[in-house]
Amino acid sequence: MGAAVTLNRIKIAPGIADIRDKYMELGFNYPEYNRAVKFAEESYTYYYETSPGEIKPKFCLIDGMSIDHCSSFIVPEFAKQYVLIHGEPCSSFKFRPGSLIYYQNEVTPEYIKDLKHATDYIASGQRCHFIKKDYLLGDSDSVAKCCSKTNTKHCPKIFNNNYKTEHCDDFMTGFCRNDPGNPNCLEWLRAKRKPAMSTYSDICSKHMDARYCSEFIRIIRPDYFTFGDTALYVFCNDHKGNRNCWCANYPKSNSGDKYLGPRVCWLHECTDESRDRKWLYYNQDVQRTRCKYVGCTINVNSLALKNSQAELTSNCTRTTSAVGDVHPGEPVVKDKIKLPTWLGAAITLVVISVIFYFISIYSRTKIKTNDINVRRR
């Protein structure tokens, strides 16, 4: 009958690639049972991510240990950016608490579980695991990198959501004043955030002839057309000699408007095909869509004058009238909730009372009476 398997030797050997890794060499009286169990003892303070969006210290948090052990391995700056979650199951030597036993080769969770008296020396736990959360950036350089999309790899979601929230508004206001044609600035404007529209309204009031102001007008109409009208008014008021402003701010008398109709339908500065809509107020833009332009060519082969009268024949009626520009759209107006007035409620109450009065009268039972014979002499 063979002798029992006994443990004769325990030796701790350091790892080679990582100083945190160690080997526990177990020597038995039968060499075939010898094992080298690899484990780790964490000693680093993390200031980097072990993988994108997470930090996983080599520490096994066993029952009875405070979670503060996990947070002690990350720098204070990261402590504000990451949250601790339930990590993967792990095993740790009780006589070296926090050590992380690697599962590899023959050493598996099942192998440890099947070892006799293993629970006397090995405890189960969960590995420390941190994941990144949304947080407010504390320094201007980080805000600049995230909001200008220079480097968004480590940006929290609230600073990397295509400008859907207000977190980048302050930075983009200053950034876009210096570079209004920047694609990121135009993307911020397309999100239709009011700080963006207000910023571009101020910029275009000085530089309405810039190309990005055409995009600005296209974006804000029809719902926020006042931002564009304000910019056009200020620009044209400061540049009255600019021919582009002659439709919005015509320097001559209004006699043409009186006899020929709205100048957006006949004035060259308004009707030319090359005209950009940004040079029209919103109401002029709407008006121009209602103008009908009729163009024709008249060829006169002969002209006969009789008593200062001339008769010309043209084929203008054969052409189809072309409607002007596409309508810029109607702004969304929220209807106010109409509450019933006291007068209406009082009238309704009186009518209901009268109806109930007549119903009560006609619903009463008829009183039985005796017939009385009256004789007249």
From Swiss-Prot:
It comes from the Viruses. Residues 2-341 are virion surface. It is found in: Virion membrane. Residues 363-377 are intravirion. GO terms for biological process: membrane fusion involved in viral entry into host cell; symbiont entry into host cell. It holds the Pfam family Pox_G9-A16. Keywords: Disulfide bond, Fusion of virus membrane with host membrane, Late protein, Lipoprotein, Membrane, Myristate, Signal-anchor, Transmembrane, Transmembrane helix, Viral envelope protein, Viral penetration into host cytoplasm, Virion, Virus entry into host cell. One of its GO terms (cellular component) is membrane. Its main location: virion. InterPro entries: Pox_virus_G9/A16 (IPR004251). Induction: Expressed in the late phase of the viral replicative cycle. Most cysteines are linked by disulfide bonds. They are created by the viral disulfide bond formation pathway, a poxvirus-specific redox pathway that operates on the cytoplasmic side of the MV membranes. A lipid is attached at residue 2 (N-myristoyl glycine). The chain crosses the membrane at residues 342-362. It is a single-pass type II membrane protein. Part of a stable entry-fusion complex (EFC) which is at least composed of proteins A16, A21, A28, G3, G9, H2, J5, and L5. Formation of the viral membrane is necessary for the assembly of the complex. Interacts with G9. Belongs to the poxviridae A16/G9/J5 family. Envelope protein part of the entry-fusion complex responsible for the virus membrane fusion with host cell membrane during virus entry. Also plays a role in cell-cell fusion (syncytium formation). This is Virion membrane protein A16. It comes from Vaccinia virus (strain Ankara).
